[in-house]
């Protein structure tokens, strides 16, 4: 999986001038975005909002954790990334995680980091993964009223970072 750069704000209409030339060349009919990442409410005519960005962020978190895109061929017949993760959360989450992020997957000779013994590191890392998964699920809920605010998302990500010593400094 390659690196991703997201700018969900580009889904907005680009025009803000009164010029008809600018309007005709930059006006978008509706929100644009990639299938699987764009908030479902945009398909029903909802206005662009931070809730849509929260949804997209949640999808990216889940994608990062399980190593599958929301457009993966396995997601068909009503199964989508959210449901796939939700079915396994939290008891069977390790079974669907991208093996490269599962604590215990490390190259030979790689240090666990810090002063923690390996088991403590594994426990702390899995706690971080569980919290990130929960946040990804909350953010990618189908309706905006079920999603956290962007401020809540920021606070949660900050708390997760602070709880995981390997991410410090």
List each model region and its residues.
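Cytosolic eukaryotic protein kinase-like domains
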Residues: 1, 5-169
């Amino acid at each position: 999986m390659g690196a991703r750069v997201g700018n969900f704000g580009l889904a907005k209409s680009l025009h803000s001038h009164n010029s008809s030339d600018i309007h005709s060349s930059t006006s978008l009919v509706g929100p644009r975005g990639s299938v699987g990442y764009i908030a479902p409410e945009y398909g029903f005519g909802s206005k662009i909002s931070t809730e849509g960005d929260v949804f997209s962020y949640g999808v990216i978190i889940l994608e990062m954790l399980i190593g599958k895109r929301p457009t993966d061929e396995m997601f068909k017949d009503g199964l989508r990334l959210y449901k796939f993760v939700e079915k396994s959360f939290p008891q069977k989450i390790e079974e669907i995680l991208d093996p490269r992020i599962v604590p215990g997957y490390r190259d030979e000779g790689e240090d666990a980091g810090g002063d923690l013994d390996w088991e403590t590191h594994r426990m702390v890392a899995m706690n971080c993964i569980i919290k990130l998964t929960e946040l990804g699920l909350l953010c990618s809920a189908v309706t905006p009223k079920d999603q956290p605010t962007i401020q809540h998302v920021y606070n949660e990500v900050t708390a997760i970072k602070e709880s995981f010593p390997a991410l410090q400094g």
